[in-house]
């Protein structure tokens, strides 16, 4: 069971369930739903469909409000619903400090007089402004599956390769030969970092596959500072070693010299048992997205 003080990993499945909780809390007398781009568009469109109301999009960066199209079923015949005269429900995914919330209130408040703010998640410690309605309390730090490498923690995150950056190698591809090389070249991306370079990748792939591995990263626009590959000469030789200990050792060496800001330093590992072992050895935060588990 998850302790309340334990950082959470929110999967997309969990997110959908929590959006469902929000649907039960929103007022039905609103004239229009406003989604905050980009993070709030998923819950906002669900709320708009649920309430059968038109939707508009609020851009935090440009301060603009855009119509999202209402579909032919909305509005009475061809009379267009004018959100500006009515009650607006603003929807976003999370409020952590309340800073973004304050900006959005400024943008929306200029154009609409009657506004209700709702988010799926809210940090109980948000000090700059909380929404009027939220479905779930979510403390900091936490990871969102859809925002894994786009958060402020990214700069302090070391990662495993297969099963995180790309889908795992299937057993029949693992021949340490042509099939495996084909897998490395054509692996399907999974969680791709776009915001900033990954400080450290530690992979069980062996050193001789460095060139195609780096080529794959470049092709998918992934930037990284350090890529550590297994020193074994063959995958058979590697199988005799303790891969979790190898990852833990390299993670720890980097973590000791890394200054987290805002922190915490963590490792993202695709395999549950390895993740648990890396956490045990290093006593640091390790996340396994596949099982939505966080060791702290």
What are these regions (language model features)?
Residues 159-171, 229-233, 291:
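Short loop/turn segments at strand-loop or loop-helix junctions that form parts
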Residues 191-214, 228:
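Substrate-recognition element of Asp-dependent hydrolases with the DxDx(T/V) motif
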Residues 55, 88, 114-116, 199, ...:
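Hydrophobic anchor at the start of a short beta-strand
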Residues 37-40, 206, 271-272:
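Helix N-cap/beta->alpha junction signal
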Residues 29-33, 198-201, 262-266:
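Short active-site oxyanion
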Residues 208-296:
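C-terminal cap/substrate-recognition subdomain and adjoining C-terminal extension
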Residues 92-93, 160-162, 267-272:
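Acidic di-acidic motifs
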Residues 1-158, 166-187, 215, 219:
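PRPP-associated nucleotide enzymes
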